[in-house]
C-alpha cells in the first residue's frame, strides 16, 4: 500500500504543534511509512491573493519551504493551482514560475494539477466575493500554458474529471494535459463545493474516455512508475463500489424545492 498524505498546511501545523522543525517532523513521517505528499493548499502562490482567500493558511514562503524540505528529505510531491476566484493571469504566471523554479532546484514534483475554482457552495462564492470560476477557455489555457511553462522540468500535467467532467477533461487532454486524475472512491471536497461529476471513475471508464480521443492509456503508480499487467487486470475487473446515497449541495436542494413549489402551484 502506498500512503499519500499530509498537505504542506498539515505538515506546518503538525510540526508547530509538536514544537519540531519542519524537517524533523517530515523525517518522522517518513520513518513511520509515509510515501509521498500532496502539493495541495497551494491555491495561488501569491500573498496578494492568499491574504484574501486563505489568510488562515500557510503563506507562499511557508508552502514553498515545506515542499522544498520534503523534497530534500526524499519525498516526491504533487503541485497544484486553484484558479478562477479573485486571481488574475498575473498571479497565475507568478505561481507557475515559483513552481518551475522550485522544481529546477529539487526535481521533486511528479505532476502539476490545475484545479478550477468551484464557486457554487464555496464560502467566497456564496457571499458573492469571487468570480464564478474560470471560463472554459481559461481552463484550457491553464493546462496548455502549464505544459509550455513547466516543460521539461515537470512532464505530467494532470486534468481533473472531478472538477471538469468527462467532456472537460477530453478537451484538456487534447491541449496540454497528458494525465487523467485518479479513480477515487468517495470524493467529497469538490462535491461539497457544488460539483456533480460523481465520486468514482472506474479504470475501464478512464481507459474508454482516453481511447475516445485516439490516445493510448497507460496505467501508472502514484510515483509515476509502471504497473504490472496483473495489477492492471485486477483493477479492470474489480467489483463496483456499493452505490452511495448523496445529499445534494445546498444550492441544488434549494432549486429542487423551488421547482417542487412551482409544480404544486401549477397543479
PLM regions: where:
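Auxiliary Fe-S-binding modules of radical SAM enzymes
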Residues: 103-267
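Aromatic-anchored, glycine/proline-accented short structural segments
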Residues: 70-114
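Active-site-proximal loop/turn and secondary-structure-junction residues that shape catalytic pockets
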Residues: 7-12, 41-44, 81-87, 116-120, ...
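Catalytic cores of alpha/beta
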Residues: 20-26, 86-100, 163-175
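Alpha-helix N-cap and loop-to-helix initiation/capping positions
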Residues: 17-24, 54-62, 87-94, 130-138, ...
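Conserved SAM/AdoMet-binding glycine-rich loop
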Residues: 1-67, 71-78, 85, 107, ...
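Conserved, mostly hydrophobic/aromatic
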Residues: 37-40, 70, 99, 146, ...
Amino acid at each position: 500500500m502506498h500512503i499519500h498524505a499530509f498537505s504542506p498546511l498539515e505538515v506546518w501545523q503538525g510540526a508547530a504543534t509538536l514544537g519540531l522543525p519542519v524537517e524533523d517532523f517530515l523525517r518522522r513521517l517518513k520513518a513511520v511509512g509515509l510515501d509521498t505528499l500532496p502539493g495541495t493548499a497551494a491555491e495561488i502562490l501569491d500573498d496578494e491573493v492568499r491574504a484574501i482567500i486563505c489568510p488562515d493558511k500557510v503563506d507562499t514562503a511557508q508552502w514553498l519551504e515545506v515542499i522544498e524540505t520534503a523534497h530534500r528529505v526524499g519525498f516526491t510531491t504533487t503541485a497544484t493551482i486553484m484558479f478562477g476566484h479573485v486571481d488574475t493571469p498575473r498571479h497565475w504566471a507568478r505561481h507557475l514560475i515559483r513552481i518551475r523554479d522550485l522544481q529546477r532546484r529539487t526535481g521533486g514534483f511528479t505532476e502539476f494539477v490545475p484545479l478550477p475554482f468551484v464557486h457554487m457552495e464555496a464560502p467566497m462564492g456564496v457571499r458573492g466575493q469571487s468570480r464564478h470560476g474560470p471560463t472554459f477557455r481559461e481552463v484550457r489555457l491553464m493546462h496548455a500554458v502549464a505544459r509550455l511553462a513547466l516543460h521539461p522540468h515537470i512532464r505530467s500535467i494532470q486534468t481533473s474529471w472531478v472538477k471538469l467532467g468527462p467532456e472537460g477533461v477530453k478537451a484538456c487532454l487534447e491541449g496540454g494535459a497528458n494525465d487523467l486524475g485518479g479513480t477515487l472512491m468517495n470524493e467529497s471536497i469538490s462535491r461539497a463545493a457544488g460539483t456533480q461529476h460523481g465520486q468514482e471513475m472506474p479504470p475501464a471508464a478512464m481507459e474508454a474516455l482516453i481511447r475516445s480521443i485516439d490516445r493510448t492509456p497507460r496505467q501508472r503508480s502514484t510515483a509515476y512508475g509502471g504497473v504490472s499487467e496483473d495489477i492492471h487486470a485486477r483493477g479492470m475487473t474489480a467489483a463496483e463500489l456499493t452505490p452511495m446515497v448523496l445529499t445534494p449541495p445546498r444550492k441544488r436542494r434549494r432549486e429542487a424545492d423551488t421547482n417542487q413549489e412551482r409544480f404544486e402551484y401549477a397543479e
